[in-house]
UniProtKB/Swiss-Prot annotation:
Name used for this protein in its record: 1-acyl-sn-glycerol-3-phosphate acyltransferase BAT2, chloroplastic
Alphabetical keyword list: Acyltransferase, Chloroplast, Lipid biosynthesis, Lipid metabolism, Membrane, Phospholipid biosynthesis, Phospholipid metabolism, Plastid, Transferase, Transit peptide, Transmembrane, Transmembrane helix
GO MF assignments: 1-acylglycerol-3-phosphate O-acyltransferase activity
GO BP annotations listed: CDP-diacylglycerol biosynthetic process; phosphatidic acid biosynthetic process
Higher taxonomy: Eukaryota, Viridiplantae, Streptophyta, Embryophyta, Tracheophyta
Enzyme Commission number, as recorded: 2.3.1.51, 2.3.1.n4
Cellular compartments per GO CC: chloroplast membrane
Originating organism: Brassica napus
Transit peptide endpoints, chain numbering: 1-49
Motif (HXXXXD motif): 188-193
Localisation: Plastid, Chloroplast membrane
Comment text on domains: The HXXXXD motif is essential for acyltransferase activity and may constitute the binding site for the phosphate moiety of the glycerol-3-phosphate.
Catalyzed reaction equations: a fatty acyl-[ACP] + a 1-acyl-sn-glycero-3-phosphate = a 1,2-diacyl-sn-glycero-3-phosphate + holo-[ACP]; a 1-acyl-sn-glycero-3-phosphate + an acyl-CoA = a 1,2-diacyl-sn-glycero-3-phosphate + CoA
Length: 344
């Protein structure tokens, strides 16, 4: 086995069907006697530390596995030997069950990512001037929908993505008019989802974590567009976010949710949270499901600095009406899941 070819992090589960001492096992059995003398214990620990210099240990999503919760090699009152199981960088190379190896990033993808950031950054700086200039008039005449700001956002998103990937949009006839308040929901695969959805030109308010609002230019634009802030893992912030969204819908604006709550790391559709559908059920507005495919391959989660080649497909489903949040949630998720399965 070539040690130099071992990947950095192993992502396989902590238990395997193969014998623990087989040549392909990634678990190393180290028998240690708790009743050994101090000198033998010190020599053993010193040997282990010396061996660890050649093989880097890293956290791989699970904790180290011990047969005993507490282990002290210097205690002499217990003569029972026990086994310590450790995980190393060699595990990813030796175990065929490793499912998510680190992908090799091509130089062209890195260059495309740099160009994408430059185009998006320069266009944002230019267009933010128009948004700031028109903001007082937007507050006076269109305080809730803010169509002018969303037009600027559509222009910015289109300029940013047009040179790098094509977007195939299906079901444009299912989009309600911009004056009709709706609750839009979609699967979430990549940072590019925001750009793709903004390019549709609909005036909807996204939900975004508060940390993004402090970013210059981008945070200013989000505030002027009326993006709703949310502190993750804060119950009070979640309640305030839902109240704010319900108020916007009652005033005639539309809101956009990613019901999964976060980006999918493997492209699979996760479970939906019911907050968006509760708003739709209480206000009586329709739910418009949207399926996004391809963004996760072009810019994977955790690799926002690269941009692979590929195309994006957007499927806009027919609006769903209902008065029960559970039924709305199940129907919207089923529509998105069916379209993803048909394409894949």
């Amino acid at each position: 086995m070539d040690v130099a070819s071992a990947p950095g992090v192993s992502s396989h589960p902590p238990y395997y069907s193969k014998p623990i001492c087989s040549s392909q096992s990634s678990l190393i059995r180290i028998p240690i006697n708790k009743g050994c003398c101090f000198a033998r214990s010190s020599n053993l620990i010193t040997s282990l530390h010396a061996a660890s210099r050649g093989v880097t240990r890293r956290t791989s999503g699970v904790q180290w596995c011990y047969r005993s919760i507490r282990f002290d090699p210097f205690k002499v009152n217990d003569k029972n030997s026990r086994t310590v199981t450790v995980r190393s960088d060699l595990s990813g190379a030796a175990t065929p069950e490793s499912t998510y190896p680190e992908p090799e990033i091509k130089l062209s993808s890195r260059l495309r990512g740099i160009c994408f950031c430059l185009v998006a950054g320069v266009s944002a700086i230019v267009l933010i001037v128009l948004m700031i200039t028109g903001h007082p008039f937007v507050l006076l005449f269109d305080r809730y929908r803010r169509k002018f700001h969303h037009f600027i956002a559509k222009l910015w998103a289109s300029i940013s993505i047009y040179p790098f990937y094509k977007t195939d949009i299906q079901g444009l006839e299912n989009l309600p008019s911009s004056d009709t308040p709706c609750v839009y929901v979609s699967n979430h695969q990549s940072f590019l989802d925001i750009y793709t959805l903004l390019s549709l030109g609909q005036s909807y308010k996204f939900i975004s974590k508060t940390g993004i609002f402090v970013i210059p230019v981008i945070g200013w634009a989000m505030s002027m567009m009326g993006v709703v802030p949310l502190k993750r893992m804060d119950p009070r912030s979640q309640v305030d976010c839902l109240k704010r969204c319900m108020e916007l819908v009652k005033k005639g604006a539309s809101v956009f949710f990613f019901p999964e709550g976060t980006r999918s790391k493997d492209g699979r559709l996760g479970p939906f949270k019911k907050g968006a559908f509760t708003i739709a059920a209480k206000t009586g507005v329709p739910v418009v499901p949207i399926t996004l495919m391809g963004t996760g391959k072009i810019m994977p989660t955790g690799s926002e600095g690269i941009l692979n080649h590929g195309d994006v497909r957007v499927i806009i489903h027919k609006p769903i009406y209902g008065s029960k949040a559970d039924l709305l949630c199940d129907e919207a998720r089923n529509k998105i899941a069916e379209s993803m399965n048909l394409v894949s």
